């Protein structure tokens, strides 16, 4: 089974995270940030991943450190769980509608970290979650996992719906990218490595 568990502890946060790429029954998220818990749960369910997150952070300051560090640890776990990247599709993309909003995510498990984020999030806060942290989360995951990730809100009016569409699309795109493909020999690259 492709899986990884890691702990990251700093003076600002303590993150314990486990990711299972090939199992989807065990999802438990506790970050202390309700909206973020909801988004991570949606990511795991729509990606069909097992994901357990326990996070303690300096949320009395704000949620920035917790959200970013969860992204870092998720990226690290993804990188470790993928092992040698043999026989995976490598690429994945998904459009996801959420009522009036439409989100799009494209992923390349390339060994090169890059993140492009486009989306106008007009409501600055949802509960205890600063909506600008959506971009910080995706950047942290892409950098730590060494993947290329494009996330875009094509249109919409409700900020909650826009972010929800992105997290669901992230799960679906990542599922496609990490899926094993019997038609691929070795890694999906003319270089012979990723």
Curated annotation (Swiss-Prot):
<keyword id="KW-0456">Lyase</keyword>
<dbReference type="InterPro" id="IPR020565">
    <property type="entry name" value="ImidazoleglycerP_deHydtase_CS"/>
</dbReference>
<keyword id="KW-0368">Histidine biosynthesis</keyword>
<dbReference type="Pfam" id="PF00475">
    <property type="entry name" value="IGPD"/>
</dbReference>
<keyword id="KW-0028">Amino-acid biosynthesis</keyword>
<dbReference type="InterPro" id="IPR000807">
    <property type="entry name" value="ImidazoleglycerolP_deHydtase"/>
</dbReference>
<dbReference type="GO" id="GO:0000105">
    <property type="term" value="P:L-histidine biosynthetic process"/>
</dbReference>
<dbReference type="InterPro" id="IPR038494">
    <property type="entry name" value="IGPD_sf"/>
</dbReference>
<protein>
    <recommendedName>
        <fullName>Imidazoleglycerol-phosphate dehydratase</fullName>
        <ecNumber>4.2.1.19</ecNumber>
    </recommendedName>
</protein>
<dbReference type="InterPro" id="IPR020568">
    <property type="entry name" value="Ribosomal_Su5_D2-typ_SF"/>
</dbReference>
<dbReference type="GO" id="GO:0005737">
    <property type="term" value="C:cytoplasm"/>
</dbReference>
<comment type="similarity">
    <text>Belongs to the imidazoleglycerol-phosphate dehydratase family.</text>
</comment>
<keyword id="KW-0963">Cytoplasm</keyword>
<dbReference type="GO" id="GO:0004424">
    <property type="term" value="F:imidazoleglycerol-phosphate dehydratase activity"/>
</dbReference>
<comment type="pathway">
    <text>Amino-acid biosynthesis; L-histidine biosynthesis; L-histidine from 5-phospho-alpha-D-ribose 1-diphosphate: step 6/9.</text>
</comment>
């Amino acid at each position: 089974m492709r899986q990884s568990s890691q702990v990251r502890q700093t003076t600002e946060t303590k993150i314990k995270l486990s990711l299972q790429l090939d199992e989807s029954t065990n999802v438990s998220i506790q970050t202390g940030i309700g909206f973020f818990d909801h988004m991570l749960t949606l990511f795991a369910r729509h990606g069909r991943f097992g994901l357990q997150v326990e996070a303690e952070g300096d949320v009395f300051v704000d949620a920035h450190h917790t959200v970013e560090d969860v992204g870092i640890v998720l990226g690290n776990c993804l990188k470790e769980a993928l092992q040698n990247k043999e026989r995976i599709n490598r690429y994945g993309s998904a459009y996801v509608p959420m009522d009036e909003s439409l989100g799009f995510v494209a992923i390349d498990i390339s060994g090169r970290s890059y993140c492009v984020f486009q989306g106008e999030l007009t409501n600055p806060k949802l509960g205890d979650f600063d909506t600008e942290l959506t971009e910080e989360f995706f950047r942290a995951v892409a950098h730590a996992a060494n993947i290329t990730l494009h996330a875009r809100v094509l249109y919409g009016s409700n900020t909650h719906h826009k972010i929800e569409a992105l997290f669901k699309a992230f799960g679906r795109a990542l599922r496609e990218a990490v899926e094993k493909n019997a038609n691929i020999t070795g890694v999906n690259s003319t270089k012979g490595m990723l």
